[in-house]
């Protein structure tokens, strides 16, 4: 019994041990299985993570590649547009000098390590893929990078363009995006734009909808402009709460330079985005000062308010403020911003001119031509004159370079066939014509008012949306001309050259096609744009409006250079500075004083022309009618101060006055064959002739109908025989 109990006890212990062992091993097997499953699961998750990371990396690299490709395309288009502007070395030098920033040393944060040279910034903000070389890094630039802190911008002048876009609701997205691309290019060239949106389109839409709905439509179009600029790679921002409207009786409204009471109330809301390289876009909406009620206003009032703000003409200060404090405050405002351009993008284009073949003023010297342009616009509605077409028909021909083997008859022969020209908008209703004239008059008045309070260096450009959107795209090939040449963008060309795309003193026939169906090279097609400056007055002695320039009559006193109206010392300085030669004044006076036809002076003797009546050799100077008929109108001196050469349009102003007001029937002159200005003369003359056995080239502007063989021979004889009056006598050798 004892043995049985012992065996039973041992059996239970063994069984328990076996059960425990089995349980233990079972747990081990379960844990091993779980480990295998967990390892497999972890391995699968890692693969998925790696795949996702690889996919994300590929997408990122692809995105970067596409971004670089897009940036290169933008930069290529940008550089081609700049190169297509055809700026000369002098114009490029002037652009760099005018847009040179102040030399400032902004304070550095304490934690910042001293950096001697920063080669990671892009010169002149020309693109993120181009690292600045030493030449680029040291070149003058003022465009501020959006990422640069405000402390680094405090010392630089912001160069600003004020842009008004009229009727954007009539423009498709492609054109609007093109305008945004152009404004982006201007920003990269250093001219950051403030855009004002004008939804007036000549219809009565704003009268058919509520005031609230009209304001919403204006904001919608402003948002389209913001989107178009953003799409070009330059950031824009809608700013709709900076324009205030003064109530009746307020101090602001009483100020004459704040006409209409429209003014800027929150300057920093404008300046903050400008400092960061962001383009503010303003709808033509203002808020009353007292109640902050939103009101739609005219875009021209907004533009003038911004012009006054950027020019430093702010609302009046407190009467208790010290004058010196006010003066310093105004100087600080003017040193912060330079409003260099006023750009009006209008579907109607530039200011019409009834007496020009192309139909538009190319250049307006507002000081001299504003009233004349206004009266012409009111009288004709801007329609082209058929009478002017016939009188300038000969200007269509190319410039002739006469040689000895070409007979005179080859260029005096009249062309057969009359030009047929249809005036622009001749079939429009009187209401439409009145609307066009209203918009043109508003643009003309806006340009004049803005330029009147801006520095003389500021200018204005009025052009069409299509021209503003032109980014130098390739044109389809035309068999009749070189159809693949790039067309200039007038905004970029104007920024780099401070000139219109075409000179205003060119003969009208060379400014564009004679007929709308005539094939013409795109690079020579005239854009319907008008360039304007405040300019300078032009004084003409004697005034051809009251005393037409005619050959001298025996016994009748003639004007002389010693006349009290003429400042002879300043005239002599003008001639000597322009020609870089000393004039033998007494010898010159003896030669010209009895032959002077008239004198043209631009501004404060910045440019001028002296014209005489010359007798061909062999013709007796007896005062007879026959002698007077043989007298030749001769341009004796054409001079522009060196500091005014190549800019400001001084030469064009003088030349245009000469051929338009003084000698519309033609004038001749000569120039040394190696004179670098001959190209300029050649473009403005009707014909040229290299005089045999001399170092002279003859030019003249005489129309074909006024030219005959005797006149041509008289021109040639006079240009060969006139003796120079320089003090060094070197001109005699020519």
UniProtKB/Swiss-Prot annotation:
Cellular component, GO annotation: mitochondrial matrix
Family affiliation: Belongs to the acetyltransferase family.
Metal-binding recorded as keyword: no
Top enzyme class: transferase
Record pathway: Amino-acid biosynthesis; L-arginine biosynthesis; N(2)-acetyl-L-ornithine from L-glutamate: step 1/4
Keywords: Acyltransferase, Amino-acid biosynthesis, Mitochondrion, Transferase, Transit peptide
Enzyme Commission code(s) on record: 2.3.1.1
Keyword hit for Mitochondrion: yes
Protein name: Amino-acid acetyltransferase, mitochondrial
Cited InterPro entries: AceGlu_kinase-like_sf (IPR036393), GlcNAc_Synth_fun (IPR011190), Vertebrate-like_GNAT_dom (IPR006855)
Organism in which the protein naturally occurs: Botryotinia fuckeliana (strain B05.10) (Noble rot fungus)
A Pfam family hit: NAT
């Amino acid at each position: 019994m004892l043995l049985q109990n012992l065996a039973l006890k041992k059996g239970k212990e063994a069984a328990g041990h076996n059960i425990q062992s089995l349980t233990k091993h079972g747990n081990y097997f379960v844990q091993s299985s779980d480990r295998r499953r967990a390892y497999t699961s972890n391995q699968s998750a890692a693969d998925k993570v790696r795949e996702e990371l690889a996919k994300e990396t590929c997408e990122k690299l692809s995105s970067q590649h596409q971004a670089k490709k897009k940036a290169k395309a933008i930069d290529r288009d940008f550089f081609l547009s700049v190169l297509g502007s055809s700026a000369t070395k002098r114009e490029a030098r002037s652009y760099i000098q005018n847009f040179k920033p102040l030399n400032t040393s902004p304070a550095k944060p304490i934690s910042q390590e001293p950096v001697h040279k920063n080669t990671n910034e892009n010169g002149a903000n020309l693109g993120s893929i181009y690292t600045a070389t030493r030449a680029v890094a040291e070149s003058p630039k003022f465009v501020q990078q959006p990422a640069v802190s405000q402390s680094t911008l405090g010392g630089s002048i912001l160069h600003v363009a004020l842009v008004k876009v009229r009727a954007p609701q009539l423009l498709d997205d492609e054109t609007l995006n093109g305008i945004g691309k152009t404004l982006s290019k201007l920003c990269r060239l250093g001219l950051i734009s403030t855009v004002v949106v004008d939804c007036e389109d000549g219809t009565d839409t704003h009268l058919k909808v509520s005031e609230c709905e009209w304001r919403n439509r204006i904001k919608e179009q402003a948002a389209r402009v913001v989107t178009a600029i953003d799409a070009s790679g330059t950031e824009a921002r809608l700013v709709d709460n900076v324009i205030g409207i003064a109530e009746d009786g307020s101090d602001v409204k009483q100020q004459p330079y704040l006409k209409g009471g429209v003014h800027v109330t929150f300057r920093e809301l404008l300046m903050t985005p400008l400092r960061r390289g962001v383009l503010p876009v303003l709808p033509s909406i203002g808020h009353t000062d007292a109640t902050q009620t939103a009101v739609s206003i005219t875009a021209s009032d907004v533009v003038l308010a911004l012009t006054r703000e950027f020019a430093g003409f702010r609302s009046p200060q407190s009467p208790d403020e010290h004058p010196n404090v006010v003066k310093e405050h105004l100087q600080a405002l003017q040193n912060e911003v330079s409003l260099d351009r006023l750009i009006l993008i209008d579907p109607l284009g530039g200011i019409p001119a009834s007496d020009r073949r192309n139909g538009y003023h190319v250049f307006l010297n507002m000081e001299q031509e504003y009233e004349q342009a206004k009266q012409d616009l009111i009288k004709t509605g801007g329609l082209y004159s058929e009478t002017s077409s016939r009188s300038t028909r000969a200007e269509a021909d190319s410039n002739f370079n006469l040689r000895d083997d070409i007979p005179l008859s080859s260029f005096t022969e009249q062309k057969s066939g009359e030009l047929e020209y249809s005036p622009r908008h001749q079939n429009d209703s009187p209401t439409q014509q009145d609307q066009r004239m209203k918009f043109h008059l508003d643009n003309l008045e806006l340009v004049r008012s803005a330029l009147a309070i801006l520095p003389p260096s500021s200018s204005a450009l009025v052009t069409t949306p299509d021209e503003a959107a032109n980014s130098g795209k390739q044109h389809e090939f035309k068999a009749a001309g070189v159809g693949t040449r790039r067309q200039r963008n007038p905004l970029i060309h104007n920024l780099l050259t401070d000139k219109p795309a075409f000179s205003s003193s060119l003969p009208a026939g060379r400014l564009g096609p004679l007929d709308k169906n005539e094939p013409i090279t795109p690079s020579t097609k005239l854009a319907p744009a008008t360039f304007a400056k405040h300019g300078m007055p032009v004084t003409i002695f004697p005034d051809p409006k009251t005393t037409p320039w005619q050959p001298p009559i025996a016994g009748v006193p003639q004007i002389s250079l010693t006349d009290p109206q003429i400042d002879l010392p300043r005239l002599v300085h003008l001639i000597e500075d322009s020609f870089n030669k000393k004039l033998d004044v007494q010898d010159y006076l003896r030669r010209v004083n009895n032959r002077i036809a008239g004198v043209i002076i631009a501004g404060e003797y910045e440019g001028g022309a002296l014209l005489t009546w010359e007798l061909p050799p062999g013709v007796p100077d007896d005062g007879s009618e026959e002698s007077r008929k043989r007298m030749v109108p001769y341009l004796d001196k054409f001079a522009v101060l060196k500091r005014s050469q190549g800019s400001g349009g001084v030469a064009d102003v003088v030349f245009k006055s000469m051929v338009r007001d003084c000698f519309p029937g033609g004038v001749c002159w000569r120039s040394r064959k190696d004179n670098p200005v001959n190209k300029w003369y050649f473009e403005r003359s009707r014909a040229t002739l290299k005089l045999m056995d001399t170092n002279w080239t003859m030019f003249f502007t005489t129309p074909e109908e006024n030219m005959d063989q005797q006149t041509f021979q008289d021109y040639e004889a006079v240009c060969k025989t006139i003796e120079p009056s320089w003090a060094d006598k070197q001109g005699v050798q020519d």
